[in-house]
């Protein structure tokens, strides 16, 4: 039951992130966990990711989609490094807010970008952006999660049609029985 409720929690978090994201999200087989394409204005996530890894990657890419839409940074340059710092640090804070521990991955990921080459002034500007973005995402995600909190699982269209057909069938059967009683 705990795993099932955790799974439902993950589903609600994914749905909330989809609502918070202002760009389309596509799940496709990838060699990487995910990426945001400013040209397509779309987030692509590896279809093989699940649970906390999927949510963490979604947060990271949603952050890119909110902060770096007009980016002309080139892989490996200082601007790209700063953008990765913003996205990963924001993802860490937001994920941590929802009891998803990404510290092992996050610390290694950030170190791989050579953050020791960033000046204190650059770091200060990035940190302000990270805090503001994380706070905004958490507020929006919380609103979306609150909407889902009291919702009953929705029935599919087919389930609704079957239920209506059964009801109609009962009514017809009842009318038929009443008609048969009157005739006898």
Regions found by a protein language model. Give the residues of each.
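Hydrophobic (often cysteine-bearing) scaffold residues that line and stabilize catalytic clefts
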Residues: 55, 59, 83-86, 126, ...
């Amino acid at each position: 039951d705990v795993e099932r409720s955790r799974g439902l929690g993950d589903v609600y978090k994914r749905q909330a992130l989809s609502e918070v994201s202002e760009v389309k999200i596509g799940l496709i087989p990838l060699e990487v966990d995910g990426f945001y394409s400013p040209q397509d204005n779309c987030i692509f996530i590896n279809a093989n990711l699940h649970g906390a890894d999927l949510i963490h990657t979604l947060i990271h890419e949603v952050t890119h989609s909110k902060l770096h839409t007009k980016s002309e940074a080139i892989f490996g340059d200082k601007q790209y490094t700063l953008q990765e710092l913003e996205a990963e640090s924001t993802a860490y804070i937001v994920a941590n807010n929802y009891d998803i521990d990404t510290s092992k991955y996050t610390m290694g990921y950030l170190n791989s970008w050579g953050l020791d080459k960033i000046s204190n002034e650059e770091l200060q500007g990035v940190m302000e952006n990270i805090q503001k973005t994380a706070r905004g995402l958490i507020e929006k995600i919380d609103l979306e999660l609150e909407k889902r909190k009291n919702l009953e699982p929705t029935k599919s269209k087919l389930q609704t049609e079957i239920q209506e057909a059964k009801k109609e069938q009962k009514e017809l059967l009842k009318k038929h029985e009443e008609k048969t009683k009157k005739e006898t």
